[in-house]
């Protein structure tokens, strides 16, 4: 039997051919990174758009709460020679604080809209989102304080306090109590929306890392 011999031929690549292939191998990670970056930007832009919508909703509820409380006044149809029975929001310092606090919240939400728009245009920007988180948290504290203190007064107006001999005035001033109750509810709605805004901004910052 004859033995067959095989010949091994080594083909040596030139430097020029190696240089021509090297960029092709290096482009894959770059393209993949660009795709991931684009997907992350799209998600953040969606979060920023939702943030803007929630800010508009919070503005509407805060404005409604401020206007409802500031225009609350009721005068009973009967009066005596010396007294006229009237109830107004500025009779109670707590309700006055409520109006001032909600006016500050409304002004802040208007001023925060440009920052929210910047986050839509530049979804990877960190500083605007960080500022929104900080100031949103401060505004949450202010709104919660105003709504909580006013809710206590509204409760007393509806139920009174027998131990302190505080009478429930809502039986006489029904319209007054309805308006202040609606204002307090709108303020708590604003608090809930602001909490969602902080969660959204924190989620967007987490995606950045």
Swiss-Prot record:
Compartment(s) where it occurs, according to its Swiss-Prot or TrEMBL record: Cell membrane
Major localization listed first in the record, in broad terms: membrane
Organism: Nicotiana tabacum (Common tobacco)
Name this protein carries in UniProt: Casparian strip membrane protein 1
Function as written in the Swiss-Prot or TrEMBL entry: Regulates membrane-cell wall junctions and localized cell wall deposition. Required for establishment of the Casparian strip membrane domain (CSD) and the subsequent formation of Casparian strips, a cell wall modification of the root endodermis that determines an apoplastic barrier between the intraorganismal apoplasm and the extraorganismal apoplasm and prevents lateral diffusion.
Listed transmembrane segments: 47-67, 97-117, 130-150, 180-200
Biological process (GO), any one: cell wall modification
Topological type in the membrane: Multi-pass membrane protein
Keywords carried by this UniProt record: Cell membrane, Cell wall biogenesis/degradation, Membrane, Transmembrane, Transmembrane helix
InterPro entries given in the database record: CASP/CASPL, CASP_dom, CASPL
Segments on the Cytoplasmic side according to the record's topology features: 1-46, 118-129, 201-209
One GO term describing the cellular component: plasma membrane
Pfam families: CASP_dom
Membrane topology, Extracellular segments: 68-96, 151-179
Family in the record: Belongs to the Casparian strip membrane proteins (CASP) family.
Subunit structure: Homodimer and heterodimers.
